[in-house]
Amino acid sequence: MCKSLRYCFSHCLYLAMTRLEEVNREVNMHSSVRYLGYLARFNLLVAICLGLYVRWEKTANSLILVIFILGLFVLGIASILYYYFSMEAASLSLSNLWFGFLLGLLCFLDNSSFKSDVKEETTKYLLLTSIVLRILCALVERLSGYVRHRPTLLTTVEFLELVGFAIASTTMLVERSLSVILLVMALAMLIIDLRMKSFLAIPNLIIFSVLLFFSSLETPQNPIAFACFFICLITDPFLDIYFSGLSVTERWKPFLYRGRICRRLSVVFTGMIELTFFTLSAFKLRDTHLWYFVIPGFSIFGIFWMICHIIFLLTLWGFHTKLNDCHKVYINHRADNNSLDRIMASKGMRHFCLISEQLVFFSLLATAILGAVSWQPTNGIFLSMFLIVLPLESMAHGLFHELGNCLGGTSVGYAIVIPTNFCSPDGQPTLLPPEHVQELNLRSTGMLNAIQRFFAYHMIETYGCDYSTSGLSFDTLHSKLKAFLELRTVDGPRHDTYVLYYSGHTHGSGEWALAGGDILRLDTLLEWWREKNGSFCSRLIIILDSENSTPWVKEVRKINDQYVAVQGAELAKTVDIEEADPPQLGDFTRDWVEYNCNSTNNICWTEKGRTVKAMYGVSKRWSDYTLHLPTGSDVAKHWMLHFPRITYPLVHLANWLCGLNLFWMCKACFRCLKRLKMSWFLPTVLDTGQGFKLVKS
């Protein structure tokens, strides 16, 4: 008896200690990453303090000493608010504002007379170290999965540091200060552009970086400090271009879900910025040195710019009008769990966005041409406004481009559930013992309900949900799948996406086990798909909740000629029954449907110790997939419906330029990069563009 009690006690103690060690390892890793961020912040604080001390020591300016002491006092107050009053938001806001302000002072105070001073050199190395630590911390956080991406345009930290930096620029002359304030606004626009993953965000980043150190931009006296400020702010949105798994509508949620008046005012604000840029461009007419080139060029391209931007503003206004109609439907049908993106698709927003993308491209082209004709390398305000307008128009282009690519795709789904848990020695399904029938029926019914919920939530047309306890014969499955794969929309074209769900017995190599000893291979299914799909560009997404889905996930990656994806699951072979229940078929379906149908879910696919792990694979051409594009007649009808008659001649120019495919080389490179990403760096979460996502653990 004593031995049994001692054994039980020692066993329980061992389990508790093992679990404690695992938790400690996870906590220690998270703490290490957090401390790395603290180290980068502390290193930056030391660099700022040392730099300001050097400037006070060499210039004997008492104002620097007052600001320095006041800064330390404010940071002390922030620490007291954080640790003693638990006012974390107020404390962090105060400290971030002062970090930006003090770093701005370090940038703008003249250091030309003591650049070779040892303390000044130490400050530079500390700033460079801060840059490295900041990049390393952000990268490790994302590789470890500790960052939870949320929809936002600018974070509070970014906004306050930008404001603090802009306030510090007021220590200079008015014209130089205005140039820097506009440059800070341009940096904010660039951060938003990167976070929204706009199509032209990376070129904008390159242009901004190249122009950043022009003397006409009033680049601060300390370029290392300014580079530290710029890189520390740009690191997170730049890395999130790859690491963020948010869908298009999730990324743009702060804008799309904004109030009607705010969105209308944003169009007015955009018009004011564009008009200011045009006015500053007109200052080039004062240059009499090249009047024979400037005056005709500005007259021609200025008129072209005006017409394009009238169309640009009317396009934005029309977009918000259609978005307001979608919001009315969304508010009236919120109880039905209809998301805004599905309502936008039903309202024809995709067609509008695809045409608007071409029109906004003209605005970008006109801005680039006018900027080149009116180039003023000695006017920092002009260059700063140019850097504001570019990402602003790039965001509009990116919004229309991404909404046009992700909205409006029609889809149809078919589910097959064969609840077979026990197999004969030759691998064929057999009838279950009576005591297991009720449990299996409940689990199978749960799978059917889950997949029907999935189809209904994402507005996927349901072809059928077949449930068979005795299995399906090859001929029966053949006829059903062929009928499913040849389905078309009411208007006649094929559906954009076909979703096939299967849960049942499979062989070790992934084939579906059918009644009568037959099997269904992936090659056979793809042969049927090619026969029905023909020259169309539809997609096939196969969802497997079976014990052997890995072979199909690997095999689909070798397909070259079709757009096919396989979402599978891997059940843990050995599980400690004292910590978790053994995984069963249906567990993956439950979690995956909950993940895709509940935006507030707490499911983490990369969590350690999961008994059901997700995996997916896509064909080589998956990233090349695009929906049907509008024709020239579609563009002409849209133009006559939304724009004044005076702009009609641009219809032919629009169709001609779009037919040229000016970005064919960029698109080819972009396509190669996307293929490389999907083959070598497969994302943890892949947005299908239909509202649901494929995931891997």
Curated annotation (Swiss-Prot):
Glycosylation sites: 111, 337, 533, 598
Record keyword Zinc present: no
Record CDD domains: TMEM168 (cd21494)
Localization (cell): Nucleus membrane
InterPro entries registered for this protein in UniProt: TMEM168
Membrane topology: Multi-pass membrane protein
Keyword match DNA damage: no
Record GO terms (molecular function): sodium channel regulator activity
Transmembrane parts of this sequence: 36-56, 63-83, 89-109, 172-192, 199-219, 223-243, 265-285, 293-313, 352-372, 380-400, 646-666
Domain of life: Eukaryota
GO cellular component: nuclear membrane
GO terms (BP aspect): regulation of ubiquitin-dependent protein catabolic process
Keywords, comma-separated and alphabetical: Glycoprotein, Membrane, Nucleus, Transmembrane, Transmembrane helix
UniProt record similarity statement: Belongs to the TMEM168 family.
Task performed by this protein: Plays a key role in maintaining the cardiac electrical stability by modulating cell surface expression of SCN5A. May play a role i the modulation of anxiety behavior by regulating GABAergic neuronal system in the nucleus accumbens.
Stated name of the protein: Transmembrane protein 168
Taxonomic source organism: Rattus norvegicus (Rat)
Gene giving rise to this polypeptide: Tmem168
